[in-house]
């Protein structure tokens, strides 16, 4: 991804912007891709299930309700995401294994880190519209992330491809 979110936001005013309240934990600060969505709460079984699918340069956006009590992604799932071809994962919640996460060459954004693991019950919803920080995150939209924030567009901008 060469284009910056600030420049693209100016070019595409219809885009929705999420402020950079997220911290970068992965090996790439900039990434882009079509969005898959997931709504869970302190349970990451569905996170694993979705990341086991071929990522094809997509970005998984996980709405964990902003909970910082348990981690929805750690080193094992981050490596799985990379091996399956995901461009990145955004977690509106917490992650763990931060030292391992830095070694994985994909975008990994989350609100914070915590050592506590999550439940594994499989509760949640896949590919549903999300509302995060007042912004609608739709399955199939195109997400671009860099140090200035996250930009959501209905379609990929000209010349921008999925990946990091």
Swiss-Prot record:
Q: Cell membrane: is it a keyword of this entry?
A: no
- Output the InterPro entries linked to this UniProt entry: RraA (IPR010203), RraA/RraA-like (IPR005493), RraA/RraA-like_sf (IPR036704)
Q: Which GO terms describe its molecular function?
A: 4-hydroxy-4-methyl-2-oxoglutarate aldolase activity; metal ion binding; oxaloacetate decarboxylase activity; ribonuclease inhibitor activity
- The residues listed in the UniProt record as binding substrate, with positions renumbered to this chain, are 74-77, 96
Q: What class of enzyme is it?
A: lyase
The cofactor required is: Ni(2+); Co(2+); Zn(2+)
Q: Which SUPFAM superfamilies is this protein grouped with? A: RraA-like
Quaternary organization:
Homotrimer.
Q: What does this protein do?
A: Catalyzes the aldol cleavage of 4-hydroxy-4-methyl-2-oxoglutarate (HMG) into 2 molecules of pyruvate. Also contains a secondary oxaloacetate (OAA) decarboxylase activity due to the common pyruvate enolate transition state formed following C-C bond cleavage in the retro-aldol and decarboxylation reactions.
Report the sequence similarity comment from the record: Belongs to the class II aldolase/RraA-like family.
Q: What is this protein called?
A: 4-hydroxy-4-methyl-2-oxoglutarate aldolase
Organism the protein comes from? Thermus thermophilus (strain ATCC 27634 / DSM 579 / HB8)
